[in-house]
């Protein structure tokens, strides 16, 4: 395992443990459990913190410490608003039939697509809900055959989407910002924790979202109300918008990349915990 990966995982352990403790403390029925665990968890936090410090000092190259990553567009094959893709003849026929005009191909640096399904509310696609399409995606793929692509046609999708860690190498493409919209209204004021209030949650590694809007309409008076919570390692959000009021975008942990995205909110609308998020917003 590369040093960068170990460093990332140690950092994520600290974040996830603190989130677990916060969750216990916010649950009234688990108050005694939280108190019993607070000291052991505090000791564990110190252990992981020291381990991370030693590892960073001993194994991570000095040249990489404190340097902001500057990705080149060729890494993502974005050129003049286009995303180049490589796919089989069958998959390409489906792809072209649904007319994703803004994402037609270039010849080099193709992103390989293993299969494609469409979500269309009028029933003319493969699925009418995003959750059903996510459920149909293969589990625990290694990416060698490319991404499983979900094309979500224009519409307002009132559903809470959760992409589990076994749905690796999933790509979700919409018709554009404010065209393909996933919306919800969970909030802390209505009894949800900040962590569980998200309209869209993803923890699957190598997730990609393009041309989507993620929205939480709870309102400013409802306090924390997350539109997107991401704990997906090596995930990418390109040309997406995140709309809410408080804690709109919750970048929880691990490595994430955002490019040409819009984030809307009124207070603390971007929240992060020990994650690496090279942005180009």
Where do the PLM segments sit?
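Extracellular/luminal ectodomains of secreted and membrane glycoproteins with large N-terminal domains
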Residues: 1-83, 103
């Amino acid at each position: 395992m590369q040093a960068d990966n170990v460093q990332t995982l140690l950092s994520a352990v600290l974040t996830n443990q603190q989130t677990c403790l916060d969750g216990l403390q916010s649950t009234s029925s688990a108050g005694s459990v939280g108190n019993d665990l607070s000291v052991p968890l505090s000791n564990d936090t110190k252990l992981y913190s020291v381990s991370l410090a030693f590892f960073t000092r001993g194994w991570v190259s000095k040249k990489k410490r404190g340097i902001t990553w500057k990705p080149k567009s060729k890494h993502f094959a974005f050129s003049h608003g286009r995303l180049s893709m490589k796919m089989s003849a069958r998959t390409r026929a489906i792809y072209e039939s649904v007319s994703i005009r803004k994402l037609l191909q270039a010849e080099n640096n193709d992103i390989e697509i293993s299969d494609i399904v469409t979500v269309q509310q009028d029933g003319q696609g493969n699925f009418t809900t995003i959750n059903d399409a996510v459920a149909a995606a293969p589990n625990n793929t290694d990416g060698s055959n490319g991404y499983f692509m979900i094309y979500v046609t224009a519409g307002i999708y009132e559903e809470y989407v959760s992409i589990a860690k076994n749905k690796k190498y999933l790509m979700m493409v919409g018709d554009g910002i404010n065209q393909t919209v996933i919306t919800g209204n969970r909030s802390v004021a209505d009894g949800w924790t900040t962590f569980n209030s998200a309209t869209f949650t993803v923890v699957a590694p190598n997730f990609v979202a393009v041309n989507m809007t993620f929205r939480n309409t709870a309102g400013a008076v409802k306090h924390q109300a997350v539109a997107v919570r991401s704990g997906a390692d090596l995930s990418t959000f390109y040309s997406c918008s995140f709309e809410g009021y408080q804690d709109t975008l919750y970048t929880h942990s691990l490595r994430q990349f955002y490019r040409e995205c819009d984030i809307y909110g009124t207070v603390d609308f971007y929240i992060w915990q020990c994650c690496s998020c090279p942005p180009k917003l």
